[in-house]
């Protein structure tokens, strides 16, 4: 008889993906969370997984409990109940560290690009071998006969320390999560500790100065655009249909590839995947074939057209990610005005990276800013406001409210890029409704 898994905080990106994976493996899965809609719950609902309001009545002693990292005895009735009755529970990353031991595991770590790279690696590998995977966009898949397991490896609060994968990619090291990390040295130390746990091979971006200092008992392969790298992407052509490039390993051509994705960062992500699969012994012709059909991951350059208006939704919430997303938009739409609509995520990050955010947003033609989205972990002390960021942006920059997004209509032949990790999608939805109403009124 299969176990029943109960997820405390099932709508979290990693939690929902793990719930789907276990459900597909034949286990009984349920979970609880707040009632507010979150984009991950659609997949859970489609799978028929029950989502309950938080209540200690949801828990019984025969269940295996998995608790989201944000939920503690003092802020969640179910965690409090479990602790009061001495019912064991694991955190997401603790469970995952044990779970992956039954597979050949391939991790993807890094400050930026984890989700897109995990999605790409999962997509290609699942077409060549039975593969289970967890992607940070809330997507999870459990193959009953899986030999391989691909997963996103998160550095926040050093959650990746229970992981000991056979292979891992590290896309980059950058200062983020200032509510936890004390500085770049602290971030580096976390990734360096993780790298020491990789067993067979580590693949790191060679032009990242911090990653060049990483050490590991496993062989380290550098990938990138420079001849000093072990895997080099070259002969690159970026068009409105995607990116074409070749990859060589130690001066020997290993393949020619087309990726239907945009931006320099996605070429790097693909090169990391190619390097990993080459070292793992997979046929590069098959890898090239399956790269062609990659359709992306949720909330990473997700496009839609409303009333002939192009809207892009992206999770970008760090200056490096904003630059990458706007670069991708310019590649696909070189003759259109690029409009950035950005919501800063957390007061601590906004304070720490205020000048960097302003610099990144200057890559757009016009900028609109939503009020800062505070984390549940922090209190707004009034130290920073979104108007402070608007004042530093050199491009035309305005602050908008979710109730009035009409200033966005002041542009012709434009692409609207909504970016953020908070509730920026509410602003996007308001804009979509405004466009739809304009269509009705013009009929």
UniProtKB/Swiss-Prot annotation:
Subcellular location(s) of the protein: Cytoplasm
Q: Which reaction does it catalyse?
A: UDP-N-acetyl-alpha-D-muramate + L-alanine + ATP = UDP-N-acetyl-alpha-D-muramoyl-L-alanine + ADP + phosphate + H(+)
Which InterPro entries does the record associate with it?
Mur-like_cat_sf, Mur_ligase_C, Mur_ligase_C_dom_sf, Mur_ligase_cen, Mur_ligase_N, MurCDEF_pg_biosynth, UDP-N-AcMur_Ala_ligase_MurC
Query: Can you name a GO cellular component term?
Result: cytoplasm
User: MF terms per GO, please?
Assistant: ATP binding; UDP-N-acetylmuramate-L-alanine ligase activity
Which domain of life does the UniProt lineage start with? Bacteria
Q: What is its main location?
A: cytoplasm
Q: Give the stretches traversing the membrane.
A: none
Q: Which UniProt keywords apply?
A: ATP-binding, Cell cycle, Cell division, Cell shape, Cell wall biogenesis/degradation, Cytoplasm, Ligase, Nucleotide-binding, Peptidoglycan synthesis
Q: Where does ATP bind?
A: 110-116
Question: So, what pathway does this thing act in?
Answer: Cell wall biogenesis; peptidoglycan biosynthesis
Name of the top EC class for this enzyme:
ligase
Query: GO biological process annotations for this chain's record?
Result: cell division; cell wall organization; peptidoglycan biosynthetic process; regulation of cell shape
For this protein, what is the EC number?
A: 6.3.2.8
Keyword field contains Cell cycle:
yes
- What is the purpose of this protein? Cell wall formation.
What NCBIfam families would the database entry show? murC
Write out the similarity annotation. Answer: Belongs to the MurCDEF family.
Q: What is this protein called?
A: UDP-N-acetylmuramate--L-alanine ligase
Q: Which organism is it from?
A: Streptococcus equi subsp. zooepidemicus (strain H70)
